[in-house]
Amino acid sequence: MLKSIQKRKNKLRAQRKARVKGKIFGTAELPRLTVYKSNKHFYAQAIDDNAGATLASADGRKLGLGANREDVKKVAAEMAKNLASANIETVVFDRNGYLYHGVVASFADALREAGIKF
């Protein structure tokens, strides 16, 4: 039963991701900031889709953090620092099919508080 629930959740997330994928595009001047969350960790990266390159990233696993709201705020602070070192002030936020709720919303709010615009 639990596996079928998880399969349905993953299928719905994939549908949301596919629906949005054609509308969001990142460049070197305005990169796409995408997030990924697992049950244990939270990851984020700024991507230039023209070059297919990652411009900045933050990894909660490397920082020894979990995937709760308080730890995600620390990942957002690290991401803001990495974006500032790459001279990036504005990004296009790609929630990667996740609902804008919980840790994804906390991450976005913490990035805005750190001065990143989107």
Curated annotation (Swiss-Prot):
Keyword vocabulary terms for this entry: Ribonucleoprotein, Ribosomal protein, RNA-binding, rRNA-binding
Originating species: Sulfurovum sp. (strain NBC37-1)
Record-level GO cellular component terms: cytosolic large ribosomal subunit
Quaternary structure note: Part of the 50S ribosomal subunit; part of the 5S rRNA/L5/L18/L25 subcomplex. Contacts the 5S and 23S rRNAs.
PANTHER family xrefs: 39S RIBOSOMAL PROTEIN L18, MITOCHONDRIAL, LARGE RIBOSOMAL SUBUNIT PROTEIN UL18M
Protein name: Large ribosomal subunit protein uL18
Highest taxon above the source species: Bacteria
Keyword Nucleotide-binding assigned: no
Family from the record: Belongs to the universal ribosomal protein uL18 family.
Function: This is one of the proteins that bind and probably mediate the attachment of the 5S RNA into the large ribosomal subunit, where it forms part of the central protuberance.
A GO BP annotation: translation
GO molecular function: 5S rRNA binding; structural constituent of ribosome
Gene3D superfamilies to which the protein is assigned, alphabetical: 3.30.420.100
Record bears the keyword NADP: no
